[in-house]
Amino acid sequence: MNERTLFTTFWTNESTTTRNVLARIPEGSTYRPDPKSRPAQEIAWQIVCEEKMLIEALETGRAEWAPSPLPATMKEVLDAYDEQRARMARRWNELPDARWDGTLEFFGSQRPGSTMAWGFLFDIVHHRGQITTYLRAMGSTVPQIYGPSADEP
């Protein structure tokens, strides 16, 4: 298995888990564990925007962080994630090798495409983990991630 196939496999699996976590965010929740922390819906939207930015960067050769405004509802966030996720595998597979193996412009510096992809996948997993620490405090449950949770043994 080559690195890109491995990445696509991991991305697909992690996006399923991410979707399960995002679906647990209660509609209308403004919970944040600290005034410096962001609410879960805002973190969820960052995940959506990071995924969009990454695939577009790999397609065009240039990363531009210009997230769309935060949707008013969690349902809108989930709908956007579902729509984007449905097209991601095809988009990963259609990337020219030169984009995956080449460099991308990222905030004024050049970064290897594959390294950037893995880095963003890990960042998305990190933000997903942040959300899981909010879920019970918001009155929700934590889904299985890499194995059972206290809520889903």
Language model: regions and residue ranges:
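Acidic catalytic patch
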Residues: W92-F107
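Short, contiguous alpha-helical
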Residues: T8-L22, E27-P69, E105-P153
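Helix-adjacent hinge/juxtasegments
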Residues: E56-P96
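Active-site rim elements
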Residues: N2-T8, M74-L78, W118-L121
